[in-house]
């Protein structure tokens, strides 16, 4: 975080945390550990980026040729989009690519969260386990998300999608970008899955760990102030709140508005 000189999760870091816990114990105060070096939570101060599990997103390009590098390609036949696996002699191809942002991790992948817990929560527990459920109340998570302002993706989506719905996610990805028959049904399937993966593979794992270690979890996601904002980042905050012992929301600045008069 800005201005921090102490190395995150270093021995010096935990020595200072220990001083805070000791003082809180004397004063009868609770301690809540912030689970990240800044925000958004989930990448252990950059440590998990070394594993290469970068956050992924989808990008559509309208191109003049079929691309073997695309995850899925489509052509427009009449009013319908049809998936193709080779050159079709068309003048326009709708090629969907998987892209990566190297500054954050894929929270839809359960293994990433397991690594996050091992790199963060377990270290605090190793140091302060005698105070968990006593002076140490729990952890605060800050703005975990699957991405922002782009369509989310993860390497776990193809298998999880087929398991949930019985068909290939690549058959309908164009429906996330273009309108056609069946688009609403596909979008419903896709976003329900993304919501479940985000909740279960990230927050539920943290929640279950906290339950098993005698502490609580609180915090918030991001863009809670509108449904549109939620879809960009977490596919809805209400399912997520089930796995926060103390649900939270972040409303920055003192400007309050509503959906009628934003």
Question: Model segments located where?
Answer:
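Acidic-and-aromatic substrate-binding clefts and catalytic sites of carbohydrate-active enzymes
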Residues: 3-14, 223-230, 252-260
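Mature extracytoplasmic enzyme cores
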Residues: 7-188, 195-202
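Active-site core of glycosidic bond-cleaving carbohydrate-active enzymes
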Residues: 188, 192-196, 200, 222, ...
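Substrate-binding cleft/loops of secretory-pathway carbohydrate-active enzymes
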Residues: 40-53, 144-158, 218-253
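Surface-exposed charge patches
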Residues: 22, 208, 239
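Short, acidic/polar
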Residues: 117-128, 229-240, 259-262
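Beta-sheet entry/capping signal
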Residues: 28-32, 134-139, 207-209, 214-219, ...
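Aromatic- and acid-rich polysaccharide-binding/catalytic face
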Residues: 89-110, 236-259
């Amino acid at each position: 975080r800005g201005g921090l000189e102490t190395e995150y999760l270093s021995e010096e870091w935990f020595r200072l945390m220990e001083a805070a816990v000791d003082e809180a114990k004397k004063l009868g105060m609770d301690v809540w550990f912030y689970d990240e070096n800044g925000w958004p939570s989930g990448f252990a101060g950059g440590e998990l980026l070394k594993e290469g599990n970068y956050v992924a997103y989808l990008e559509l390009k309208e191109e003049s040729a079929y691309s073997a590098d695309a995850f899925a390609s489509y052509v427009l036949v009449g009013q319908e989009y049809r998936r193709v696996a080779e050159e079709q002699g068309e003048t326009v191809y709708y090629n969907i690519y998987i892209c990566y942002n190297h500054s954050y991790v894929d929270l839809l992948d359960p293994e990433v969260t397991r690594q996050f817990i091992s790199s963060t929560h377990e270290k605090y527990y190793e140091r302060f386990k005698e105070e968990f459920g006593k002076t140490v109340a729990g952890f605060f998570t800050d703005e975990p998300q699957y991405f922002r302002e782009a369509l989310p993706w993860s390497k776990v989506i193809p298998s999880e999608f087929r398991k949930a719905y019985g068909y290939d996610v690549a058959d309908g990805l164009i429906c996330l970008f273009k309108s056609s028959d069946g688009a609403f049904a596909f979008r419903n399937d896709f976003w329900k899955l993304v919501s479940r993966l985000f909740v279960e593979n990230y927050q539920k794992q943290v929640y279950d760990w906290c339950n098993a270690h005698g502490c609580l979890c609180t915090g918030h996601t991001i863009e809670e102030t509108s449904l549109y904002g939620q879809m960009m980042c977490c596919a809805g905050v209400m399912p997520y709140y089930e796995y926060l012992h103390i649900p939270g929301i972040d409303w920055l600045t003192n400007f309050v508005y509503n959906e009628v008069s934003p």
